[in-house]
Amino acid sequence: MLDQTNYTPRLKSLYASNVRAALKEQFSYKNDMQIPRLDKIVLNMGVGEAVKDTKKVKTAAEELSMIAGQKAVITHAKKSIAGFRVRELMPLGCKVTLRGDRMYEFLDRLITIALPRVRDFRGVKGNSFDGRGNYAMGLKEQFVFPEINFDKVDEVLGMDIIICTTAKTDAEAKALLKQFNMPFVS
């Protein structure tokens, strides 16, 4: 069994040993606190079929919990929208916010295992930054993660992945993610 007290995620130790120094040299920061770091990763799964069957949100939350290694929170509608047959407080999806060691573990699994399993994968878009150093991407199917059993999946669901950093600009955030071997196309 692993000794939990001495365990450090691979990307966290990579950040401490190599990434910080490379970013400090590349952007010539004067203070170590200026060096960008990962803040959190948010996984969001919207379930459109939840309007007809609210049980699908629970199965989506269970799958998202297995992927993240942390319990998912069910999200509810803020307002009623008659055109979409949505009532206020109706469950519509689920989300998980990862921080600390779980965040580094998830990013490692995403980059090394899940993204290469995506069909016709050539890399992720390099222009999906929000202008403040956060990166957003989407996956069309949840079974690119090894935690999901293909035979037990009722419905193919996609998810949004938002990687929040402390970087001030998109260039700094992209350099940080490139140091973690994020496979950008451009």
Curated annotation (Swiss-Prot):
Keywords linked to the UniProt accession: Ribonucleoprotein, Ribosomal protein, RNA-binding, rRNA-binding, tRNA-binding
A Pfam family of this chain: Ribosomal_L5_C
InterPro entries, A to Z: Ribosomal_uL5, Ribosomal_uL5_bac-type, Ribosomal_uL5_C, Ribosomal_uL5_CS, Ribosomal_uL5_dom_sf, Ribosomal_uL5_N
Matches recorded under PROSITE patterns: RIBOSOMAL_L5
Signal peptide: none
Assembly notes: Part of the 50S ribosomal subunit; part of the 5S rRNA/L5/L18/L25 subcomplex. Contacts the 5S rRNA and the P site tRNA. Forms a bridge to the 30S subunit in the 70S ribosome.
Protein family according to the UniProt entry: Belongs to the universal ribosomal protein uL5 family.
Protein name: Large ribosomal subunit protein uL5
Native organism taxonomy: Bacteria, Pseudomonadati, Pseudomonadota, Alphaproteobacteria, Rhodobacterales
